[in-house]
């Protein structure tokens, strides 16, 4: 298949259980919960997305004809040695495109594969780290993984709805925007009274990283 990628870049993971680790981010174009166009936001399933995943015009983005081409583009951004290679496949919704061939090609180049998904599509075999970020009106079919990261608060997606799922770690991430400070205080209070949940702060935004 041809892979449509918005951007590929090296940074530090800013969120969740792998925060602070060097990683190549591979942002796939397209999502099944929103078109990515502002005129469609009000009727989208996910209305608070803060990411541009439309098209292939971002840094090192493009259309890649084969899984090998995609893996080579990811590897080209890695500046470390052969060990501890990490690629974070995100979007949009990466499982619309990330397939067995791409997983095999990335593994062949020594990358651990982490994925940030909305959880509406079952993960293919071989993904090393699954982070599910549920959205209020979307079903969660990927019910296990390394972490569940819930943007908080969402009126129709409160933490107790997901607390019994089979994840190793549970994170609340304050919703960004004009109410971020208030949302952060709400998340802190919830974590204090529900210790199963940990606070995830978008540290890359505070540090000015992509």
UniProtKB/Swiss-Prot annotation:
Binding locations of [4Fe-4S] cluster: 31, 46, 49
Record keyword Iron present: yes
Reaction catalysis annotation: 6-carboxy-5,6,7,8-tetrahydropterin + H(+) = 7-carboxy-7-deazaguanine + NH4(+)
SUPFAM superfamilies, per database record: Radical SAM enzymes
Binding site for S-adenosyl-L-methionine: 92, 133-135, 173-176
Top-level EC class as recorded in UniProt: lyase
Domain Radical SAM core: 18-210
A GO biological-process term: queuosine biosynthetic process
Cofactor binding note from Swiss-Prot or TrEMBL: Binds 1 [4Fe-4S] cluster. The cluster is coordinated with 3 cysteines and an exchangeable S-adenosyl-L-methionine. Binds 1 S-adenosyl-L-methionine per subunit.
Keywords: 4Fe-4S, Iron, Iron-sulfur, Lyase, Magnesium, Metal-binding, Queuosine biosynthesis, S-adenosyl-L-methionine
Protein name per UniProt: 7-carboxy-7-deazaguanine synthase
Lineage: Bacteria, Pseudomonadati, Pseudomonadota, Alphaproteobacteria, Caulobacterales
């Amino acid at each position: 298949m041809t892979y449509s990628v918005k951007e590929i870049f090296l940074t530090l993971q800013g969120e969740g259980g792998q925060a602070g680790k060097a990683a190549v981010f591979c942002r796939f174009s397209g999502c099944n919960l929103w078109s990515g166009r502002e005129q469609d936001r009000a009727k989208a399933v996910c209305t608070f997305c803060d990411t541009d995943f439309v098209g292939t015009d971002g840094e090192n983005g493009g259309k890649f004809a084969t899984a090998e081409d995609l893996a080579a583009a990811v590897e080209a951004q890695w500046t470390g040695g052969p060990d501890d290679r990490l690629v974070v496949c995100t979007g949009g919704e990466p499982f619309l495109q990330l397939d067995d061939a791409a997983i095999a090609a990335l593994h062949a180049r020594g990358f651990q594969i982490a994925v940030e998904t909305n959880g509406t599509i079952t993960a293919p075999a071989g993904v090393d780290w699954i982070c599910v970020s549920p959205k209020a009106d979307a079903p969660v079919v990927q019910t296990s993984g390394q972490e569940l990261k819930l943007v908080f608060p969402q009126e129709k997606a409160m933490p107790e709805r997901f607390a019994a799922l089979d994840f190793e770690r549970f994170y609340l991430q304050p919703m960004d925007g004009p109410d971020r400070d208030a949302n952060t205080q709400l998340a802190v209070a919830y974590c204090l009274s529900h210790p199963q949940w940990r606070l995830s702060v978008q540290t890359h935004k505070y540090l000015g990283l992509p």
